[in-house]
Amino acid sequence: MNSGNPCCDPVTCKPRRGEHCVSGPCCRNCKFLNAGTICKRARGDDMNDYCTGISPDCPRNPWKG
């Protein structure tokens, strides 16, 4: 089950003790990226998406239709 990911517990593939995350656009070096870090750049008339600082996921900005 070990994916070879250094953030991943080899048995459960959940974050190792003391680490925040295993993977995701807002996860780097096993830690969440700071709130306000751009995780998806805007295209056209869209707006940037930003990390929350508490999740490895990149949430959609609330203004997307």
From Swiss-Prot:
| Location, primary (coarse class) | secreted
Cysteine disulfide partners in this protein: C7-C30, C21-C27, C26-C51, C39-C58
User: Which residues are in the Disintegrin domain?
Assistant: 1-65
Quote any Pfam family the record assigns: Disintegrin
Alphabetized GO MF terms: toxin activity
Q: Does the keyword Secreted apply?
A: yes
Q: Where in the cell is it found?
A: Secreted
Q: Which UniProt keywords apply?
A: Cell adhesion impairing toxin, Disulfide bond, Hemostasis impairing toxin, Platelet aggregation inhibiting toxin, Secreted, Toxin
Q: Where is this motif: Cell attachment site?
A: 43-45
CC terms in the record's Gene Ontology section: extracellular region
Q: In which tissues is it expressed?
A: Expressed by the venom gland.
* Domain of life according to the entry: Eukaryota
Q: Which Gene3D superfamilies match?
A: Disintegrin domain
Q: What InterPro entries does the annotation carry?
A: Disintegrin_CS, Disintegrin_dom, Disintegrin_dom_sf
PANTHER family the UniProt entry points to: ADAM A DISINTEGRIN AND METALLOPROTEASE DOMAIN, ADAM METALLOPROTEASE
In which family does this protein belong, per the annotation? Belongs to the disintegrin family. Dimeric disintegrin subfamily.
Subunit arrangement? Homodimer; disulfide-linked.
Functional summary from the UniProt entry: Poor inhibitor of platelet aggregation. The disintegrin inhibits the adhesion of cells expressing the RGD-dependent integrin alpha-5/beta-1 (ITGA5/ITGB1) to immobilized fibronectin. Inhibition on alpha-2b/beta-3 (ITGA2B/ITGB3) is low.
| Other remarks in the entry | Does no inhibit alpha-1/beta-1 (ITGA1/ITGB1), alpha-2/beta-1 (ITGA2/ITGB1) and alpha-6/beta-1 (ITGA6/ITGB1).
| Protein name (record) | Disintegrin VLO4
